[in-house]
Amino acid sequence: MSGMRGSLGVHALALAACIGLDVPVLAQDNSGLVAGKDAWARASCFDCHGSMAQGGSGGDYPVGPSLRNITYDKETMVGIVSCGIPGTPMPAWLKGAYTKVECYGMPLGSTPAGMTVPAILTADEIKALVDYVFATFVQAPRP
């Protein structure tokens, strides 16, 4: 069976080359998704948003919205994950958010009342996380 699996991998690479995709880029893109999946797990996004980003169900964590039908672009999502959403349970995950990195035009050192700032992810990790969410969960818009 492992020979079959290896053969499929070779065929996939050959197909990618035939249609003009740069095979090293495919591997690089996959590593970015792996990094995004790791950031999703480290930040425990599934606790609030559900294991398949379908929206949380409560319990011990706030009910986060479904990410499957979001209409935000990636840049907006990076901002939300980085700085959280003041007045909601959405925390700020960016290292240095509100202290070293300006959020929502607030002066450094000013954190909104009630804002949780775990600040465990780098900017690159947040970008990878957002890429992972879009590639894995967000449904393509209908024409």
What residue spans do the PLM features occupy?
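Bacterial N-terminal signal peptides that target proteins for export
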Residues: 1-12
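C-terminal capping alpha-helices of c-type cytochrome domains
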Residues: 101-143
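Electrostatic cytochrome c docking/interface patches
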Residues: 22-41, 55-56, 63, 76, ...
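Bacterial N-terminal signal peptides
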Residues: 11-20
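Gly/Gly-Pro-rich "capping" loops immediately C-terminal to redox-active cysteine motifs
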Residues: 37, 50-118
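The canonical Cys-X-X-Cys-His
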Residues: 36, 42-52, 81, 129-133
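Generic structural signal for secondary-structure transition and capping sites
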Residues: 45, 86-89, 138
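An acidic site on a long C-lobe helix of protein kinase domains
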Residues: 32, 44, 73, 121-125
